[in-house]
Amino acid sequence: MDQSPLKRNEKCMEHLDLQVIKQGLQWLESGRQIWLCTVLTTFESAPRGPGSMLVAVPSGENCGSLSGGCIEDDFLDRLKLGQFAAHNQIVRYGDGGLQPTMALPCGGVLDVLVERFEPERSSIDHFRSLETALVGRDRLSRTINLKSGSRTTGPHGPTGRSVSRSGEDVTIILGPVRRLIVAGLSTVAEFCAEFALALGYEVIICDPHPERLIKASALLPNAKLIEVLPAVFIAQGGCHAATAVVALTHDPRLDDLTLMESVRTDAFYIGAMGSSKTSLKRMDRLERIAGLTTQDMQRISAPIGLHLGSKTPAEIAISVMADILRVRNGIDRAAL
């Protein structure tokens, strides 16, 4: 087996945002007019957050999600009737927006930006820049002027709200899809991968043992399984600022090398499984042998995860993903 992912449905492994942009680009390149919808704000309960996207054509074909399905159906029905002829417009669902007013089952309210794109060079170039941002390493901002209809893109820093509005300008931030690198297979690792996929992460499992990967491929069809040492994959550019790295094997030969490479990257989360005693020994070993600094070691969560009294592999995986979610959302551990 080589060091490429095991063969599987590549589309299933792609984050939904990337699927939306790729589908829109495909339709534009084939000469079809498209509509791109983006959730701008949500009030009360809402199944999808700001930045969620859906792309559609008048025939009803679509890709993406704005809600649990009710908004999508209503939008597609109205699109077929030609109700979204404007270059762009903001539509409110759930609170007296479109007539007849549509109440959402969850009781929430969503503001959705609806943009019409013609199959022309400027539209194709715009979608290509969005695709590049989603598969790349850097965040990109796209600004839409509601009055003039102009659309511009540019680089954006590592932090900031996904959607913002200033006067007639709406700014939407896109960037690398959240990624989880699982360093070595174990039962806990398999549960972590499963939960991460449910949270919308791109999951990459690196393990040098082909027999383990073959077994896991049936359990995790939407993860990328690569026969390679995790440290090698990371050293070759496997991490970006939206990446979390978890070492869950209890094998110091695998885990230590992974941690040594991970602290040299922009990964937002690095963690290793083990008891408090094991973790102290590991940190001492990394300091002595690998020359990690205090700052390097402070980036490593060990023991990994939140203290939830977890015992079973699934419970441990929940604590790991909960801690990753905490860090990603900027919540201090002391605030829990």
Spans of model-derived segments:
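Glycine- and other small-residue-rich loops at beta-strand/loop junctions that grip anionic moieties
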Residues: G64, G68, A247-D251, G271, ...
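Short amphipathic alpha-helix with an adjacent loop that forms part of the alpha/beta core around
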Residues: P230-A241
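ADP-ribose/adenylate-binding Rossmann-like module
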Residues: C206, A244-V245, T249-D255, M260-R285
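Loop/helix-junction capping segments adjacent to catalytic residues or to phosphate/diphosphate-binding pockets
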Residues: D73, E190, R253-D256, L280, ...
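Adenosine-phosphate binding glycine-rich loop
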Residues: A267, A272-L336
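Short acidic loop-to-helix transition motifs that present clustered carboxylates
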Residues: P210-E211, A231-F233, L254
